[in-house]
Amino acid sequence: MNRLTELIREDMKPALGVTEPGAIAFAAAKARSYTNGAVLSVIVRLNSGMYKNAFTCGIPNSREVGSEFAAALGVIAGNWELGLEALSDVRQEDIESAERLVEQGKVQVVLQNISSRIFIEVVVKTDEDEAVVTIEDTHTNITSVVVNGEEKFIHSEKKKKGGKPGEKQLIHTYTLRQLCEYIDNENVSELEFMWEAYRMNLELFEAGLSSERTTFVKHLLKKNGGVVFSEEEQKTASLLCSGAIEARVLGLDKPAMSITGSGAHGIIATLPLYAAYKVNGYSKEQLLRATALSYLICMYIKEYSGKLSAFCGCAIAAGTGMACGLVYLRGGTVKMMEGAINNMAGSITGMICDGGNQGCTMKGIVAVDAAYQSAELAMDEVCVANVHGIVRSEERRVGK
């Protein structure tokens, strides 16, 4: 298997709700699995990016939000074996028990450090045991488990993205041209696994469309003539994207296929391309190849920014990947993709991330609009030149 194909396959993961509270629930459930007796306290220590992203996130299978409730529900009813879908089997009585745990002041969330590097530490103390679970770098990568003072070593996830600290990440050893050569030449049968992302993300969209709790998607449905797939590609793309993201941040009971540890990234990198595929009649093979490119560009950017950065990676990283995917579907050149990247970087890079919340829906709509404009301008050879602003670069690896 091509190592880029393997990289995508490893990075794609189902995630129920926003990935940050999902990771907190996973860690809490894992810690609880090592303890017996009644829960006395739960302490959650987070890096700043994790703290920010989970602050007002909707928690799957409930109407609650935030890190405290994610940890409480993880302790009460989480199944750590399900990873980022740890809360998929929650019942109403579990929600009520978690609410009592929070109301009694038994759950405490602490800001551990200022960093874009993922860090979660959950301490579960009962009247019989104490367990400490630590996660670092990726959302489910357990690096340490300590039970009643005894350290247990847990094998970390194998990562093909790079080697030793400071070593160039695998994705950064490729130029944009080389990524496109891979896209053009990889056997399409090796890319079939990505179809699962469309199945999963479209089911999430349908959940958002049918939910009484969503608002943005219903407005965009009206703007799209009351149908999901209209002849207006961009409106269809915005509709699909917003519906899935809104469902996700509300915590509706359907997973997204995440990329770079984010369900919203996975949605933005895929569903607008599906709109283009349906409206314009592109082949499934074209869609899969465009999706692989979209994913890789997103991953390339995220390896620079960090998984939990201060800027909106959904719009900037996934949106840029999607813009390149649109150029690819339309038969554009590598130079045109460079132009689309410049247009995205020169326009929406200033968008901040204020955590996983309803605002992500609006950011997704903005990302679609910017990506379509960036791709269309680049196809007409109109782009922000390398001498200007944040786009300026003495020597750029991508595109050479």
Where are each of the predicted segments found?
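Conserved phosphate/anionic-ligand binding catalytic regions in large, soluble enzymes, centered on
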Residues: P14-K30, K254-L271, G313-A317
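Alpha-helical support elements that line or immediately flank enzyme active sites
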Residues: P21-G37, G266-Y282, A323-G331
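Flexible, glycine/charged-enriched surface loops at secondary-structure junctions
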Residues: A38-V42, L82-L87, Q108-L111, S189-W195, ...
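A structural-propensity feature for long, helix-poor, extended segments
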Residues: L40-G83, I95-V107, Q286-M336, A340, ...
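Signature of multi-pass transmembrane helix bundles
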Residues: E103-G251
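Conserved small/polar residues in nucleotide/adenosyl-binding loops
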Residues: R396-G399
